Amino acid sequence: MAAQVVTVGESKDLRGLNLIAAHSHIRGLGVDADTLEPRVASQGLVGQEKARKAAAVVLEMIKQGKIAGRAVLIAGPPSTGKTALAMGMAQSLGTDVPFTTLAASEIYSLEMSKTEALTQAFRKSIGVRIKEESEIMEGEVVEIQIDRSVTGHAKQGKLTIKTTDMEAIYDMGSKMIDAMTKERVMAGDIISIDKSSGKITKLGRSYARSRDYDAMGVDTKFLQCPDGELQKRKEVVHTVTLHEIDVINSRTQGFLALFSGDTGEIRSEIRDQINTKVAEWKEEGKAEIVPGVLFIDEVHMLDIECFSYINRALESDLAPIVIMASNRGHSKIRGTDYKSPHGLPLDFLDRISIINTHSYTPDELRQILTIRAQEEEVDLTPDALALLTKIGAEAGLRYASNLITTSQLICAKRKAKQVGVEDVQRSFKLFYDPARSVKFVQESEKRLIGSDGVVDFRVNGGATGEPAATAAGGDSMDTSS
């Protein structure tokens, strides 16, 4: 009996205005939804099965709301997919759970203190899901009557609206008439009116009026006439972050700062009042706290004061999940003379869970480069892909990935349809990888300005090869022919 073939379908969403970035091909963690077992290559991620499964377990706990105030460190050598793993988690969480990405060097600013920048990042990563009930009227417009006064008084009108079960007539004031005119509401339209705010939403047009016109616009949407009562109670859910509430309450017309980005320092008293109010909403059942994710890339760039602040912030009631990435080994903690694993203090390492990533195999490199070529819409020959895989194994995945675009430009110059080996070879000769660049620096050491300011301006280093001019002694120059 033949084994059953299981296929996994993946839809590729339209990118829109987003440019092709280093991780734009990642659309999730690529794990099975039920067993959390990672697939070999799925949703843009390849290999790193153990790390992806560990990330999937953390992700499942985040979705269930069972984990908050925890820290996870993704540690591994460069070009092993640490940031890609975090991006996969962000894509899997969706838009409802706040996900904030922060590079460790971003917190150093002259306009804002380090702790304020970290506080804002923490507050951006905590969502508040606010529930409110609104009374709406939804139905098909039968007739609109507008009476304009000759003497210039306010306009008055009547709106006849119906469902399949009932019909009613409402009096309209001048503001409602203006709103109807602005939305271009006419007989046959299906509309929704929020009674508390007076907002009118045009949902579509009734099927009964589909023959009124011979030609319709592409945005015309035909709907069935609503049934039941005209007036209904509807629960509306808004998800905002604590940082957005902070900004709005920090100054007059604070909501404008949300768009300009000029938030500045926010006083701790305002944050305390907001925390108290959110706690009241939570007790009354009006709001729900959504712990999000704060991702700090290159976390070893933080100094000892920042780690001390994060230690305290993780113990507070309103704390997100902090995911960090580091490619350092046993290195010095910034701001101290002490060395520690991953460049993090030992008391901070004691609080975190660590996920390790390993170097990719040649087969995994080939699959990643294939995905990148598809994302950048580059057609590679099998030999060119094999050469790029070899380059990636020896010079690094990032360098090989960058060669895809440059090889495509060289290929387009000779008006070929497929990127061949000669295109990759020419691109390899034009652009140096780190190893060849280091070799060039070593060979040209005397021609380059060193840390002591010594440089040789003579062609080929002269006869003796010794420096002829120095930064300190400008008068010592060899003028012999």
Curated annotation (Swiss-Prot):
The keyword Phosphoprotein does not apply. It holds the Pfam family TIP49_C. InterPro entries: AAA+_ATPase, P-loop_NTPase, RuvB-like, RuvB-like_C, RuvBL1/2_DNA/RNA_bd_dom, TIP49_P-loop. One of its GO terms (molecular function) is 5'-3' DNA helicase activity. Belongs to the RuvB family. May form heterododecamers with hel-1/rvb1. Component of the SWR1 chromatin remodeling complex, the INO80 chromatin remodeling complex, and of the R2TP complex. This is RuvB-like helicase 2. It comes from Neurospora crassa (strain ATCC 24698 / 74-OR23-1A / CBS 708.71 / DSM 1257 / FGSC 987).
